[in-house]
Amino acid sequence: ETDSAKLSQLILQAAEDEIMFEGPNTIAAFIMEPVLGAGGIMVPHETFMPGMQQLCSKHGILMIADEVITGFGRTGDWSGSRHWGVQPDFMCTAKAITNGYYPFGACMIAEHVAEVFERAGADGFVGHGYTYTAHPVGAAAAIACLKETERLDVKTNAAARGTQMFEGAKRLMEKHSAIGDVRGGHGLMTGIEFVKDRATKAPMDPSFGLSVQKVAMDNGVMLRASGTN
């Protein structure tokens, strides 16, 4: 299926079929990236994440958003979930929460989930902490970084620069037959797929992407090669 809206509905139906086959009571949670990063920037249709949230709510399944890449402005919104109009039950974050100034990650939990543990008394205790949990330096770095991210209005700039980058990548596709697809357009998330032949979508050797990465780096542009992307 090449129509993204129809594909979204087909996947949602397949997901519900699988849920009913396995039994909703056997599924604790569903995890997804709002925009798939490492796979070469795979952007779902705008109906997919809201549809999955409705599906999870219908069957009593928690939704966990992996916002390690998409969080804190990258998509042109404060989170990738918010970009699609979704409030997940959990949001796992890292990277932009401290922008690499200090190693730090955080799992954000919706109030209705937290209340389950808080009201359970001693039975609600989950002993999953470890030595470095809630490190004060990491927490301070995260707060300072997020304040600066907000002050600079990073999300608005990411949206504008992202549009500029996406349109530029599409113009490159018009000039170079080795570019088989350009994906993205949601903030600073754009992927370029390299192919030997556009008609057959025969993939370029992964070494080609690494060569492009090196040339880009030599010219002051940071990008990441991922397979044929």
Regions found by a protein language model. Give the residues of each.
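Conserved N-terminal phosphate-binding loop of PLP-dependent enzymes in the Aspartate aminotransferase
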Residues: E1-N229
